[in-house]
Structures are given as C-alpha cells and as structure tokens.
Amino acid sequence: MDLSPVKEALAAKSFDKIADICDTLMLQVASEGIEYHDDWPYAIHLLGYFYVDDCDSARFLWKRIPTAIKERKPEVVAAWGIGQKLWTHDYAGVYEAIRGYDWSQEAKDMVAAFSDLYTKRMFQLLLSAYSTITIHDLALFLGMTEDDATTYVVENGWTVDAASQMASVKKQAVKREQKVDSSKLQRLTEYVFHLEH
C-alpha cells in the first residue's frame, strides 16, 4: 500500500488536503481488496478531517475503525479525543486533548497547525459573538493562559480593563460591497432597452 501522497502532503504541510488524499487512497485500496487496516494512518486521517472542520466525516471514520486498531493504537484514540471535544463544543477541552498526548513525529506538526488554526477560528467566533468577555473565559476559548490571551487580543485591537478583568471586542467594520458596478448596470439597461425596441 503506497501512502506516499499522504507523506508528501504532511512534508509540504498541506494539511488541508490530507483528508481528501486519505479518502481517495482508502477508496482505491478498498476497491482493490487490499487489507489496509493495520497500516492505515487513522490518526492522521482523523486530524485531517478536524483541520478542515469536518467532524461528521471524522465521526463516521471513527465508527469504521476496527476495535482492535483502537485498542492497539493510542494515538488514534487521542485524535478521536479531540473529535469528541469538537463534537460537544467543549472549546477548552479541545486544547486539553491536544496537549494531553505525546504525539508522534508524523502527527506533531499537523496537531500544532490544527491548534493554531483552531485558535484563529475561536477568535473569529468570539469576535462575532461577544461585545465583552471575561479574561478567564477568553483564556479558555483560546487555550492560553490569561496573560497570553490578554496579549493576543490586545495585539488584535481589543481593549482590556484590568480592574474588571473584562476584554472589549473590537468590532469589525461592516463591509458593504456593491453587488453591481455602474458599468454592468449600464450594459444591462442597454440590453433591456434593445430587447424592448
């Protein structure tokens, strides 16, 4: 079984392509009738789904993984631990699951990249959902210490009130794009005029 496309994507840090590559290879290997369960990079496959925010597919993959593999490969179980936290929206638990396992060299870079990406996703979620938030809750959402979380949001333009231990969200400017520019509108007007006359 040739897993070189997965290894190449990992080496190139193309983590957003891992899930699709694994899906394609799994279908190819299964259609050829090759026994692949023992050698399959299930942890990487699961992490690939989490990286592209596809918890549904990760959950179905988890259900298809043989019990013997789950019992023999703790990294697969650790990867699924992240999935369980994502599934239940336990934001702080995601970071605990990431830090709670000593990842293999193969998975370490991908887990670190996912952690960074997840922090950015959480920051965007906070940006759209809150006007103010406690420093404690902010640290839980971002998976950081309170000091690091404070520094992170201040660098992104938020204001922090040390007395109340609250952070105020810097609201994004609402961008309103004009759907049709004037030249397109003019051409449409001329076209309709031509059709009517």
UniProtKB/Swiss-Prot annotation:
The keyword Ribonucleoprotein does not apply. GO terms for biological process: COP9 signalosome assembly; protein deneddylation; red, far-red light phototransduction; response to jasmonic acid; response to light stimulus. It comes from the Eukaryota. One of its GO terms (molecular function) is metalloendopeptidase activity. Its main location: cytoplasm. Gene3D superfamilies: 1.25.40.990. Ubiquitous. GO terms for cellular component: COP9 signalosome; cytoplasm; nucleus. This is COP9 signalosome complex subunit 8. It comes from Arabidopsis thaliana.
